[in-house]
Amino acid sequence: MKTECLPFSQIPHTSRLFSDYLSYTPTVREFYPRSPLFPEWVKDEAQRVRYDDARRQTVSDTLENQNRNFGAGPKTFANIERLRRGAQTAVTGQQVGLFGGPLFSIFKALTAVKLAEQATAAGVDCVPIFWLATEDHDLAEVNHVSLVSADGVPERLAIESHGVEDAPVGTIQLGPEIDPVVERAVALLGDTGVARWLRGTD
């Protein structure tokens, strides 16, 4: 597939301010002190944001312990070691949700990964961090997921939330009540890697 890139200045109805900002003209610099160009911007931010070694070591130790308990892979521990040695971070997060929550949670995590890769390529060692907001108390907000059926109709799958309304959602352990929800999700997803993962057979 052939792609062609056009500068915004050649796209009709693009505002002059927007074009000037992307070109980072001297006039614009008066109002926007940081360049919109990622390599320059990330280098400026890396110089501006500094953490003391004690805090960095505490965060690194905590991440190492948590990820060991999660069964994380070697790349995660290599990134934690990079953080310990001074790497910057691209941080994002989301409240926990049934089966990982909405798709944009995954997009947020992937964005942190891509930003960290781009920063590293620009000369600023950077690792991605995605945190789960487990302290949220609104189970009714995260106890469900919508999947699309074979005929294209969204179907809402939910777990019961009675009896645990006041608990942080990260402390709630699901029992057999999740089984029918998992089975329905598997039926909607068909024979896919995600379905096998939900069943625990992948």
Predicted regions and their residues:
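N-terminal targeting/trafficking signals and adjacent low-complexity tails
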Residues: 1-202
